[in-house]
Amino acid sequence: TVSPLTIGELWALAIHLRILLIENAARIAVRTVVSRQARVEADALAEGLASGKTRFDDVERIMSHFAEHAKLSFMVQLMRRMRSLRDVDASTVTQLHHIMHAIGHDGEGAAHEEHGRQVANNLTMQNIFTSLKRIGEKDWEEWFEHVSLVDQTLSESESYRGLDGASRTTYRRTIEDLARHSN
């Protein structure tokens, strides 16, 4: 059965929206930081491989420490850096392609996928902040009075409409308490 939201549930809606948006922003921020760390490690590894200070076996060992989404960031950055270095032989790039295929990606498609994910995360964060701003600007009391069935019924009385906000809230809470105890 479908029942109308209680007064408390209606008031909690704005808070829950904020919480959900902030949790989503936090999730994206963590993923972004981890991906950034993966790219930094890829840069360091590329320098080490180019100078001979690092062995190729270290690629998979380092990559194994990252979450799945960061492995792609790591490999895309590593391949980009290795291609830009002059003294890297073709066999190293070929080995990187094999590792890329092992994690389920190809070189060019992976770069597009990584870029697309970064763009999507940026747009999502922008939308989250825009939504939080709009939620903050919303007149929640006006919205509440518009959607609350209790308030709509009480508003039929001219004397109720003439009350201040605190008095109207007291009326609504009293009615909800009565309803809760009548069940």
Predicted regions span which residues?
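Active-site acidic catalytic loop and adjacent metal/ATP-binding pocket
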Residues: 1
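Short, conserved sequence motifs enriched in acidic/basic residues, glycine, and aromatics
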Residues: 4-5, 162
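Helix-rich C-terminal or lid/interface subdomains of diverse kinases
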Residues: 5-54
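Basic, amphipathic N-terminal segments
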Residues: 43-182
